[in-house]
Amino acid sequence: MKPILTVLMPLLLAACGVYLPEQITIDTRGPSHRSPRPERDADGLIRTERGECLDIHGNDRRSLIRHRCHGQANQLFRLDAKSGTIRQNERCLDVAGGETRDGSRVILFQCNGRDNQRWYRDGGRIRSADSGKCLDAFESYLAIRTCNGSREQQFEWGGR
């Protein structure tokens, strides 16, 4: 009976004026895991709701922290709309080790095109395209966490 249903169902739908595309793609990961491309490039400071800025910490040039805004080169980032990466020179914001757990650290790492380096803006949030989780500045370091609407997950782009 299944082959008959397969043939009859499209005919029945067409008779009722309902036309379906040849292929339907369903995202089974749910609405919290969408990763649209950014609408345009953004650059400059990335400010937290607390008025601090994302900053490269210390001499290792990998650790990211929140710090008083001063507009120097170590606080200037660029969101590349084409690749979905947030860059600081030739390095990208990277969820360390490709982790997806809450609290996984976000560092600067050589850009490599992997999903753990792709991000998108969602209102004032910056979300990982890999996990759908939000960039979070709750601790002194940056991490990803399940999006919860807190001010630690709200960021503003621009300025120097």
Specify the residue positions occupied by each region the protein language model found.
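Sec-dependent signal peptide recognition
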Residues: K2-M9
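C-terminal motif of bacterial Sec signal peptides marking the signal peptidase cleavage site
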Residues: A14-A15
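Extracellular glycan-recognition/adhesion modules and their associated mucin-like linkers
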Residues: V18-D60, L76-T100, R118-Y141, W157-R160
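A detector of repeated loop/turn-to-beta-strand junctions in beta-rich toroidal repeat architectures
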Residues: R61-S63, N74, G103-R105, E152
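Aromatic-rich beta-strand patches that line glycan-recognition/binding surfaces
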Residues: S63-R68, S104-Q110, L142-T146
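Short coil/turn segments at the loop-to-beta-strand junctions that recur within blades
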Residues: G71-A73, N112-D115, G149-R151
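Glutamine-centric residue-chemistry signal
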Residues: Q75, L108, Q117, Q153-Q154
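Short, low-complexity, Pro/Ser/Thr/Gly-rich segments in the mature regions of secreted, periplasmic
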Residues: T146-R160
